[in-house]
Amino acid sequence: MSDPEIALALVGFGNVGRRFLRLLDEAADRLDFRWRLVAISTRRHGNVVDPAGIDPARAIRTVEAGGSLAGRDTTRQERSGIDVIRQVTESLADEAADGQLVVIETTVLDIDDGEPATAHVRASLEGQAHVVTTNKAPVAFAYDDLEGLAETVDRVFFFEGAVMDGVPVFNLVRETMPAVFVDGFRGVLNTTCQYILSQMERGVSLDAAIADMQARGITEADPSLDIDGWDAAAKTAALVNVLMGGAITPHDVTRSGIRDMDETEVRDALTHGRRIRLIASATRHGGRLETRVEPELIDASDPLATLGPTENALYLHTDLLGDIGIVQRSSSLTQTAYAILSDLTQISRRLREL
């Protein structure tokens, strides 16, 4: 059987989206599918749709040079992501019907209501496209609705890159833990806060630690979502919704960040053999879920206390296997891009089985 060809439409074309296209090229001899790029939708660089195929390298060069993908066609410049999704699902209706169209959603998290990412996923599924996203919002705000829609239209909604980059959290449970009940979890899920707290243990102020990360290009210009605990809350909601059958949003998570922490108290904890970490957790009490993101003072013997400045970890509490630990030693664009590739490979295998 020849390798299936998958048409790819990218909604969002920032660092992750561009790294993903480069990864496809770098891993070409390891892929079990063929692909062509048929659409790109961006917020700042316009949009382009071409069912015959778009040159990925040229698109990357254009965006990184600050140019517009739309060229001189201002109508393409002004269209929304939803408009592009609808155009591509209509113009490639035959491929969508055959399950060979995939929309890859990599826009940034909007913590208020999860839009427009959630609408992007919904419109893609309604157009019979499979969806892969690295955005936490659709999973954290509308997982049940979107997963139900995916089942109705016989398409997949994958999101391995939404939590811990490319580390296979969701695939681990879905593919290798049949009949196992996840009744809670606890982890360090935000690299920015982990790095800042590690620096504060050395006497560096929060503001100086943030400035250092920004200078290194490893945090956003505005790190509020990280230091106020919203990023970890969105990841907590996503994990609860998928692994524990919850139906919550990030706003349901009891949350406090590290904005008001002082380097003195962080150093004092270390002096007394303890450490402060931003911990995300979920526990089930009968029929009630308790979810939290907050700085915790933990003993040096706690596995989460041993994590380095750029390390994350998640411990799943299960009924049959006890506690299962997943540790991420570092995070990078390549790992997030790999999560998309991993999900695409799952879709390719599905096509081979048809």
Walk through the language-model features, giving the residues of each.
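Rossmann-fold NAD(P)-binding glycine/threonine-rich loop
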Residues: 108-127, 134-165, 170-173
